[in-house]
């Protein structure tokens, strides 16, 4: 990541030389473009009963724009202190409230986002956690075979090599 090099540079006591040219900041509102991108993949989910744990994170900025009022939501308010649970759905105790919500509402699927909304994980209608590897394989199959799209499949570094082996014959190029 380069953090080790930065640490060494700081600890070495070398002088920090200011940049010759000052940078600038440009404010951009990309929400509309991002939503348009996401919504082009949304099918008709009206028959699905969805339970959703937004983990008090960044997904709260867009979940209602995509899913509307249909899902049963928990922890939808953005709060960087994450008062309800750590926003890491790979830790099973963080998924317990979603599992309860799925059972209480009779949902077909439970959806949980991590804090910065770059990962989403699922539980089934019986509140069983679905392996992220399985979801990558299913989604990869959908995009490669059903939609005929080509390109990289981005996966977590912890993902099984079996996912890439499954998707490679369909044209999937894995990227960790």
Name each region found by the language model.
Residues 55-60, 117-118, 159-161:
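Gly/Ser/Thr-rich loops at beta-strand to alpha-helix junctions
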Residues 78-82, 119, 137-138, 161:
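Short gly/pro/ser/thr-enriched loop/turn and capping motifs at secondary-structure boundaries
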């Amino acid at each position: 990541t380069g953090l080790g090099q930065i640490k060494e540079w700081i600890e070495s006591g070398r002088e920090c030389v200011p940049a010759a040219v000052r940078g600038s900041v440009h404010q951009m509102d990309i929400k509309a473009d991002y939503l348009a991108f996401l919504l082009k993949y949304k099918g008709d989910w009206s028959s699905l009963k969805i339970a959703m744990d937004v983990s008090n994170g960044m997904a709260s900025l867009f979940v209602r724009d995509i899913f509307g009022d249909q899902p049963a939501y928990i922890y939808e308010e953005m709060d960087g202190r994450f008062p309800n649970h750590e926003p890491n759905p790979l830790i099973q105790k963080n998924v317990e409230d979603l599992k309860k919500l799925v059972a209480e509402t009779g949902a077909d699927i439970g959806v949980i986002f991590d804090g910065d909304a770059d990962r989403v994980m699922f539980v089934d209608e019986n509140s069983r956690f679905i392996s992220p590897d399985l979801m990558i394989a299913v989604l990869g199959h959908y995009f490669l075979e059903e939609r005929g799209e080509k390109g990289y499949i981005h996966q977590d570094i912890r993902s099984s090599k079996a996912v890439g082996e499954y998707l490679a014959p369909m044209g999937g190029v894995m990227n960790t």
